[in-house]
């Protein structure tokens, strides 16, 4: 199938522009390249400041991307002092995207922060900081400069959609996150974990076709697994 339109969420980042440093909606071009590789068009959904509720009419697939931490008020917790780059505008925009995608059964790939937000949308919660939660065997919070490197392995449950897509039971992934899923949301199952027990993959068990992955496939876009995920989303 060709000529599909994939909606991709993004955040706001202070960026050097001609007038100086100003807040801009930014997205890794790797997302666009991967969509175009499978003959799909990419459109961007930045955070909305006053109207987070908008339509997904004309959108065939959704990617909810990585970024800063999610406000813990969305899962009824007080904020940890380890939180970084929280944006309520982005939270509300992306939660609305997930709500609309579920209502319309739009195929969804949720990445890193998006994977965590998918869990929150389904009623789950997060570990606000992985080391504080007692997980110290793997350093999951590698600097952004290591985004293209394979940091650790994950194990994929063979009875899951993720396994059917990737056709492997172990996979080496990158890792640039300090938060992780705690309580699993409703109508979700765990598809992958790292050896320390951190949830690295989730997927829906209801009629909505949605997958969350804790790693960043767009930064290791030459990997077969990354291409298989985008092929699943688009085709």
What are these regions (language model features)?
Residues 115-118:
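Hydrophobic, aromatic-enriched interface-forming segments
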């Amino acid at each position: 199938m060709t000529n599909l339109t994939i909606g991709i969420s993004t955040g706001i980042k202070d960026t050097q522009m001609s007038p100086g440093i100003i807040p801009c909606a930014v997205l890794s071009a790797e997302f666009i390249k991967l969509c175009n590789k499978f003959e799909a068009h990419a459109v961007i959904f930045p955070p909305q400041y006053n109207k987070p509720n908008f339509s997904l009419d004309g959108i065939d697939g959704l990617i909810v991307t990585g970024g800063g931490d999610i406000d813990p008020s969305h899962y009824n917790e007080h904020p940890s002092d380890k939180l970084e780059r929280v944006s309520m505008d982005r939270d509300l925009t992306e939660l609305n995207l997930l709500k609309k995608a579920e209502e319309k059964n739009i195929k969804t790939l949720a990445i890193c922060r998006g994977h965590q937000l998918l869990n929150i949308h389904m009623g789950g919660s997060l570990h606000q900081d992985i080391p504080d939660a007692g997980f110290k065997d793997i350093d999951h919070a590698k600097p952004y400069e290591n985004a293209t490197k394979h940091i650790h392995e994950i194990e994929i449950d063979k009875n899951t959609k993720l396994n059917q897509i990737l056709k492997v039971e172990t996979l080496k992934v990158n890792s640039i996150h300090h938060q992780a899923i705690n309580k699993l949301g409703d109508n979700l199952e765990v598809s992958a974990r790292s050896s320390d027990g951190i949830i690295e993959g989730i997927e829906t068990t209801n009629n909505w076709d949605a997958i969350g992955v804790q790693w960043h496939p767009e930064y290791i876009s030459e990997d077969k697994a990354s291409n298989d995920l985008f092929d699943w989303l688009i085709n």
